[in-house]
């Protein structure tokens, strides 16, 4: 994953490769927000629909119902902004080798959490700035860095 790879290299002052010149966006989500979404979903399991029609099936209301949710921050962040926050929190800047978009990569992705918000009241609570700060603190402690 990009956060760990970037943290590893930035913490050591090593150059990093930045795809799409850092312009693409991703939905960086703090782990506690993901856990919160999972727990909320577990506390609200899908229920069978007594009017389930086998001729016009809807798997979300069958006798074995399920729901699929996106869990994320619902706030896309440009990769370069994420890298800047890592550098700020590690207290150093590194050389960025800017690369073009790679084959098969997508310019922007983020989670639409509207169904999870509607069904279980999920709302991510950790802004990217706070999440990166906590991630770097954890990273330093875990890997014995100051």
Language-model regions, residue ranges each:
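C-terminal substrate-binding subdomain of Rossmann-fold SDR/epimerase-dehydratase oxidoreductases
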Residues: 8-146
């Amino acid at each position: 994953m990009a956060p760990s790879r970037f943290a590893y290299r930035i913490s050591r002052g090593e150059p990093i490769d930045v795809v799409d010149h850092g312009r693409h966006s991703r939905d960086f989500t703090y782990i506690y927000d993901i856990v919160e979404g999972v727990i909320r979903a577990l506390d609200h399991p899908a229920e069978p629909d007594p009017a389930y029609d086998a001729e016009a099936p809807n798997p979300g209301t069958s006798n074995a119902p399920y729901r699929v949710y996106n869990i994320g921050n619902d706030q896309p962040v440009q990769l370069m902004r994420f890298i800047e926050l890592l550098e700020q929190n590690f207290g150093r800047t590194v050389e960025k080798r800017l690369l073009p978009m790679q084959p098969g990569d997508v310019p922007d992705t983020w989670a639409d959490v509207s169904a999870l918000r509607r069904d279980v009241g999920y709302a991510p609570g950790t802004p990217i700035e706070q999440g990166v700060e906590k991630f770097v603190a954890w990273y330093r402690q875990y890997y014995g860095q100051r």
